Amino acid sequence: MNSSQNSTGGGKRRRSVWARRLNILGIVLIFGALVVVSMRSFVVESFNDARHKSFMAPAGKMFAPASGHFYFAAGSDTGARNEPVERIMNEIRKSKARFVLYVGDLVRYRNPSHFQWMAEEIDEKLGKTPLYAVPGNHEILSVNGVVDRSLYNEVFGPGYYWFSYGEVLFVGLDSSTSAYDDEQLQWLDKTLAKIRPQFKYCVIFSHVPPVNVKVPNDHRLFDESRDRFAEVIRNRGVNLLISGHVHYYSESEFAGVPLITLPSSGQPIRSEIKKFGYVMFKADRDGIAKIKPVYVEAGDDMEHWEAFMSSALVDEDINFFSVWVFCAGVVLLFGGKILRL
């Protein structure tokens, strides 16, 4: 009898221990889910109440520089790393650059709060220097791969457009899906035919390059778009192509036109030079010249928490995840109660 009683008592104690463990884990999961949902609601509300920043593209505008020459900067692929952006924007603000061409992936996630956070950062760090952008894949793709340009258009304006500065025509294109559709290529063809003759030089800037000199079959335009793009720009007076997406600096040529790909300014570096950077250019009567790529050190003071708060935390999938975690916690609580019976 004593042996049987001891065995029964030991079993009850073990069930009691496991019941307590399940109860504790269930409470932790429920509490964690409620905290995440509460934080998400607070962050969404705080960012939506923030001062809305807009960096609308100067579509069709014609700027006249005070002198015969001017400087401009070009950057790409920030992602969610605030610290390199701060250093790069500070460098540009102190330089002679009249404006910045940003060729995509300024953000990491496509949601209003993250766009707003990055816009606030740029406005604070860049000051009065204008930023003119074209979309990258991160601006138009959701986490599950759905293409939507509406948020980008609201903050930055059209995906493709032209403007001029002095004797230079700048044409921004939307290569965010690694392709150009018929409508955009027809627009480019008409722009080069009607607008290009009014200016001495022409620069085309876009996110995805037509070719990738390091990995020929990756991170470039799809074959059909690449070939059609070449047909449109060949022998049309285009003087320079500027792209990003590949996360390294390179100089090459496409369709008889010089092509420069920009270093990453925050996303993972794919270069022997383990630094983030941008490129400075000078335009004068002799043409458009690359001055130099400018690199900054990759420090450790990255504001990942702010980036997470404005991006991943406010993603709609967080709500579904929190519901599942909450339900799991409830199940564990009931499991613990059953074990006590």
Task: Give residue ranges: language-model regions.
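Juxtamembrane low-complexity tails/linkers enriched in Ser/Thr-Pro and polybasic
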Residues: 2-15, 308-314
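N-terminal Sec-pathway targeting helices
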Residues: 6-30, 319-323, 334-341
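N-terminal active-site segment of His-dependent metallophosphoesterases
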Residues: 23, 33-117
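Extended active-site neighborhood of metal-dependent phosphoesterases/phosphodiesterases
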Residues: 42-66, 112-202, 217-240, 248-285
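A short C-terminal boundary segment appended to hydrolase-like catalytic domains
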Residues: 44-57, 253, 279-341
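Residue-level marker for buried hydrophobic side chains located in beta-strands
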Residues: 72-74, 100-102, 133-134, 204, ...
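Active-site glycine-centered loops adjacent to acidic/histidine catalytic or metal-binding residues
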Residues: 77, 104-105, 136-137, 207, ...
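Short active-site segment of divalent metal-dependent hydrolases/proteases
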Residues: 80, 107-108, 139, 210, ...
